[in-house]
Amino acid sequence: MRTFIFNFIKMKKLKLVSLAIAMACATPSFAGGLLTNTNQHVAFNRMMSREASIGIDGVYYNPAGVVFMGEGHHLAINWQLAYQTRSIENDYALFTNNVNNPITPRTFKGEAFAPVIPSFQYAYNKGRWSLQASFALTGGGGKCTFDNGLGSFEKIVAETAMAACGLAKTVDNVLGNTLGQPGMQMFTTDQAFGQKGEYSYNSYMHGRQYYYGLSVGAAYKFSDNFSAFAGVRGVYASTNYYGYVENIKVGNMPLYKVLDPNKENAANIELSCDQSGIGFTPIIGVDFKTGKWNFSAKYEFKTRIRLKNKAVNQAPSISALPDNLSRQMVGTLTQVFTNKGMTPENAQAVAANTTQAVLTNGDVV
């Protein structure tokens, strides 16, 4: 995070307030991410150009200018509320194969709600010195939830469905040629994968980001017109991302029955990721006032945060696919050969040999 602010305003008579408690609807500054939130005092919601003002909110916006306030203690306590929606459009062509929502482009809607976004600014002025501290959510500030997941999630499901249908068609073609029955269907029937790549699934995603910032510093008044500030902000990052894709069905076939019929979650995808870290931001500032004019500048150095990652992920059990596919083919073919008059033992042996020939065919593997 790095910000550089330079501004000036024509000074007017300021009313000093020792304690301010306010509530306001936050601007989209609390959208999240690694950028610095600038609405760290509710006065920002009333007027965004605060960087050259002299007031208690200057502990963040103009820390060098706070020393020009009256002597004694100054405190501001802020409570903000944020609500916003995020809409992501995706026009991936295969979304039309979704049997529950066969349209494209598709809009994936997320909702973010943060009922309490607290912050405070404190200053103690004595003589030429001003000791200051503040706390705020310098980044992030809430949780965004996508009840139907994201387009990138559905894209994986749509492509998986097409790949499954393609594999099913190839297996059926090779199987039919091997048995001398072109057009034979085992996996491409409407009761199985089908041939259109149709799919259904359930999905969910939420992300939470909080970057807590605690700043301390001091300003010194060199003259009645000029002051300077130096301080540091410590930032503690805490984030979480959680999402899943489950109950994937290709055609009328639950995908887990092919991957591992003994585990209903064999085809599920799940992500749970926690991140945390600490960083520090050096801050310097100057303020110069003359007559009815006030000039100020503040520079925040880049904050370097090394995030520690803890993830618990679940991916589909693809490794069991060949064995499960083989068992299904052997079982189905055994029944076919038994119906043609073979003994169960011979039918199973022929079914096993046929399955081996099909699955090792160059068109399948």
Describe each PLM feature range.
Residues 75-79, 133, 218, 230, ...:
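Membrane-embedded beta-strand positions of outer-membrane beta-barrel proteins
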Residues 93-103, 149-201, 238-273, 307-365:
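Solvent-exposed loop segments that connect transmembrane elements
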Residues 57, 113-118, 210-214, 276-282, ...:
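Residues that define the transmembrane beta-barrel architecture of outer-membrane proteins
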Residues 79-85, 135-141, 234-238, 290-292, ...:
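Transmembrane beta-strands of outer-membrane beta-barrel pores
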